[in-house]
Amino acid sequence: MIHVYYDKDANLGLLEEKMIAVLGYGSQGHAQAQNLKDSGLNVIVGLRKGSSSWKKAESDGFRVFKTSEAVKRADIIQVLIPDEVQSRVYKEDIEPYLEEGNALVFSHGFNIHFGQIVPPDNVDIFMVAPKSPGHLVRRMYLEGKGVPGLLAVEQDYSGKAKELGLAYAKGIGCTKAGVIETTFKEETETDLFGEQAVLCGGVTSLVKAGFEVLVEAGYQPEIAYFECLNELKLIVDLMFEGGLTKMRHSISDTAQYGDLMVGPRIVNDNVKDEMRSVLKEIQSGEFAKKWILENKANRPVFNALTSKDENHLIEKVGKKLRDMMPWINE
């Protein structure tokens, strides 16, 4: 049964005497740090020497320290740096300076779940993961609202890890919308699956395939772009607002009939079987192992495939058409 927690379930007072170090000042880092500070908590920012975010964090009113120094000063350490560098930074700048009773916080479980970070037994480990990009986490907080979040406890040395996690979630505004209890395993595996099979890998491959089929059949690339990529936002926005039902109530009956009859032919049982294979690769750690090795080898496959897609016809056509729609960036 799902457990959801709200403001009334969280005690911000548990953090009032704590020093919180937010490591990283990117999308989530800047939002979480500012929300915590505006909630009246003691927050410092930890960054690598020479970070381009150093001056930005200072201009936002934070005391900024090198990562290792921030860890030394903190009771609660939120690790908001990219997955692929977390393990190295942990070994060099976090682990040597951890003290008994500290709490390590994450917003994604990759490195804990796949054993790339193995903290000592005498610290708390929990996750608070807002389910929105950082700019929205910040904007909703400023509007007196919040975005939903996830909470997971991996290690409860203090006996209060869950309570500390809920307090942290309240500090960044998530308990206003609701915080769902999960595990590091569930968050990590479902997050990776969603990215690979649906949100990123699935969608980009579907869009490219549709575009290519139309162009190969002799249709103008610009028309193919509008039909297969540009209008995608309109449909996704409707689904975001009210699920499949609102989307289908908002499109023509012709479009809905095509949706119902043709959709299952495209995403058929073979596709679901492939999705199951992808999920098994995630669950077994095979994907994590490949990604870790790819980074150690300086990303040859990652860079080659990224470059290939950046030079795809759909990108060239898209740039030209987006230049005709200046309101997109308003």
Curated annotation (Swiss-Prot):
Domain KARI N-terminal Rossmann span(s) in chain numbering: 2-182
Gene3D superfamilies listed in its UniProt record:
6.10.240.10, NAD(P)-binding Rossmann-like Domain
> What are the names of the required cofactors?
Mg(2+)
Domain called KARI C-terminal knotted: residue spans? 183-328
Tell me the residue numbers annotated for binding substrate.
252
Q: Which UniProt keywords apply?
A: Amino-acid biosynthesis, Branched-chain amino acid biosynthesis, Magnesium, Metal-binding, NADP, Oxidoreductase
Question: Signal sequence: where?
Answer: none
Matches recorded under InterPro entries: 6-PGluconate_DH-like_C_sf, KARI, KARI_C, KARI_N, KARI_prok, NAD(P)-bd_dom_sf
According to its UniProt entry, the protein's GO biological process terms are: isoleucine biosynthetic process; L-valine biosynthetic process
**According to its UniProt record, which protein family does this protein belong to?**
Belongs to the ketol-acid reductoisomerase family.
Please report the name of this protein according to its UniProt entry.
Answer: Ketol-acid reductoisomerase (NADP(+))
Q: Which organism is it from?
A: Halothermothrix orenii (strain H 168 / OCM 544 / DSM 9562)
